[in-house]
């Protein structure tokens, strides 16, 4: 279904220089559909690919969910299927010689809080912490 959607789209928007676009071009190559999909693609140098869907220039946009959600008028269909999905992770640590280790610890506690997990979810991100 995923491959059919990509091949069947009039145009797919992706960011040429962004991490999602770099992954996408490699993925369509791996799936054997690059020539069909990229020939009709709308590649943008930077910015939000969802804007190309909102303007009618593309049927689909490829980008991180959090970026797609920020474009008014765009409905996010969902993430890629698990077998072709890639995940970006963000981690935090306190250096042994940190100038303000207590402040850093407080920030990390805030970032790991249930309130932060809710904010991540509201913004299209998924927390990997146990309470999320």
Could you tell me what each predicted segment is?
Residues 1-132:
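Exported/periplasmic ABC-transporter solute-binding proteins
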């Amino acid at each position: 279904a995923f491959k059919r959607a990509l091949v069947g789209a009039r145009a797919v928007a992706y960011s040429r220089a962004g991490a999602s676009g770099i992954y996408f071009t490699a993925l369509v190559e791996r799936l054997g559909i690059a020539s069909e999909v990229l020939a009709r693609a709308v590649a943008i140098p930077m910015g939000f690919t969802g804007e190309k869907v909102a303007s009618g220039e593309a049927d689909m946009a490829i980008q991180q969910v959090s970026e797609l959600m920020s474009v008014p008028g765009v409905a996010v269909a969902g993430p890629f299927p698990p077998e072709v999905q890639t995940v970006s992770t963000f981690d935090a640590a306190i250096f042994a010689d940190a100038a303000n280790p207590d402040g850093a610890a407080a920030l990390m506690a805030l970032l790991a809080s249930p309130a932060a997990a809710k904010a991540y979810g509201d913004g299209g991100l998924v927390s990997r912490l146990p309470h999320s």
